[in-house]
Curated annotation (Swiss-Prot):
InterPro entries: AMMECR1, AMMECR1_dom_sf, AMMECR1_domain, AMMECR1_N, AmmeMemoSam_A, Uncharacterised_MJ0810, Xdiol_dOase_suB. Residues 284-458 form the AMMECR1 domain. This is Protein TTE1956. It holds the Pfam family LigB. It comes from Caldanaerobacter subterraneus subsp. tengcongensis (strain DSM 15242 / JCM 11007 / NBRC 100824 / MB4) (Thermoanaerobacter tengcongensis).
Length: 458
């Protein structure tokens, strides 16, 4: 098996570029090099994951049309056209392995295309890499897939599912991760410019050349977003395909004269590893507070009743009484937060069980959590310390203390160390708004500390 990172600028195709493609000659040379190598491997099947196919927010996709065809007519090169037989047996095996792992996958069939009036043509993210491959080796079946906007760890696991399906088959397979790097690489970029574009490209390619897979999957999400790339998620899936293998990685070229980064790299399997990185990515530090919140919500989603308090918890969780807040995040965004300032149950364990359910089902800002969302939910549990009255705002620190503001029966609470809340003024403003108290009213302030338990996903 061979894996490759290949960009897909239509201008690199001579029939589109009409000579302009010579400005990215290094990329052309690298793609020709890869295509010659693929010819030597003589794959039965080529799998392409593309950012420009059937992309869904909450699922990966795989196309199950009997034949896969398309052209570059939208780029003025109708004569550049291809038709491939779909490797449906392997495609269905990939779907089965993906479903076993509870990864949402959309089967793009004739029925789905008709129902949603989707285009029935291969995208340029697939055609451009295959333009080079087919010049040297056209005799293969194709599998066409697209990533979804799932957590990077989940995309990696999708790659593992693909690997498992390949290993069950008798196919010789080449996997192509189609994708461009930053679309804001230079001041002449049509998508705008940010110096972070170059930082992203250099960082990703350096990590890939050293096969620092964990560091790739854990790259700064803000950097990735600001770079305006389209290939990072394809890379995450490809790295999953390589899970468990010894790999010799080599970056062949990188350039971006048109303001978009084009990186070309190859990944040769040289042996086997005794461990899988997937286990690290899916491992949660077993903080008993977080574990109980997770188990509580998952139990309620499945059985629609609160779980009993389990045995084997730390003794303090049976003995201790305190207010508890449970916070849920999904893909880095808040998904629910409900809690109690003073304890309502006989111990912290019961408090967590109840408030985890409330965070998932009773936060009026969000719809109830669905079963298919559970793998993407991250949990934190805040155990509240006793409150203290505040006489001066100088006593406050939004990183250390949460606040409660009160006026009569109205009250608003904000936990400490909330992302984006950096000043006392911001903290109080949000708490007052939650309480429905005007800033010019006479209100009291209390502060409190929390014992925070957070989920750590690697």
């Amino acid at each position: 098996m061979g894996c490759y990172l290949m960009p897909h600028p239509p201008i690199i195709v001579h029939e589109v570029g009409r000579g302009e493609e010579r400005k990215i000659q290094k990329t052309i040379d690298s793609l020709e090099n890869i295509s010659q190598e693929i010819k030597q491997k003589r794959p039965d099947t080529v799998i392409v994951i593309t950012p420009h196919g059937y992309v869904f927010k909450d699922a990966v996709s795989i196309t199950t049309l009997p034949s896969l065809e398309g052209d570059l007519s939208q780029f003025g090169a109708r004569e550049v056209k291809f038709k491939f037989e779909n490797d449906l047996d392997l495609a269905r095996e990939i779907m089965e392995e993906t479903k076993k792992r509870n990864i949402p996958i959309a089967e793009v069939s004739e029925e789905l295309i008709k129902k949603y009036v989707l285009p029935k043509k291969l995208d340029h993210g697939t055609i451009v890499p295959l333009y080079f491959v087919t010049k040297h080796y056209p005799d293969f079946k194709l599998i066409h897939m697209s990533y979804g906007f799932l957590p990077f760890e989940k995309l990696y696991e999708f790659g593992v599912a693909i690997k498992d399906a390949i290993n069950k088959s008798d196919r010789r397979v080449v996997f192509i991760a189609s994708g461009d790097l930053s679309h804001k690489l230079t001041p002449n970029s049509p998508n705008g410019y940010t110096p972070k574009g170059e930082v992203f490209d250099k960082t990703l390619l350096q990590l890939l050349s050293e096969m620092k897979v964990e560091e790739v999957i854990r790259m700064d999400k803000d950097l990735i977003e600001e770079a305006a790339e389209c290939g990072f998620r394809s890379v995450c899936v490809m790295l999953g395909v390589l899970d468990g293998y010894e790999v010799n990685a080599k970056v062949l070229s990188h350039e971006g004269p048109f303001g978009v980064g084009y990186g070309v790299a190859k990944f040769d399997v040289t042996g086997y590893k005794s461990t899988s990185l997937l286990e690290r990515f899916s491992t949660i530090e077993e903080d008993p507070y977080v574990k109980l919140a997770k188990e509580s919500l998952e139990y309620y989603v499945k059985y629609r009743r609160p779980m009993p308090v389990p045995e084997g918890l730390p003794e303090e969780m049976y003995r201790r009484k305190a207010g508890v807040f449970v916070t849920l995040h999904k893909k880095g965004e808040l998904r629910g937060c409900i809690g109690t300032v003073v304890p309502q149950k006989k111990n912290v364990a019961e408090e967590i069980i109840r408030n985890a359910i409330s965070a998932g089902f009773e936060d009026p800002r969000f719809p109830p959590v669905r079963e298919e969302e559970l793998p993407e939910i991250e949990y934190s549990v805040d155990v509240l310390m006793p409150t203290q009255p505040v006489k001066s705002k100088d006593e406050l620190d939004p990183k250390r203390y949460g606040v409660i503001v009160r006026k009569g029966f109205r009250a608003g609470l904000l936990l400490p160390d909330i992302e984006g809340v950096d000043t006392v003024e911001e903290q109080l403003s949000i708490a007052l708004r939650k309480a429905g108290i005007r800033p010019d009213e006479d209100y009291t302030i209390e502060k409190f500390e929390v014992e925070r338990h957070e989920q750590r996903v690697f």
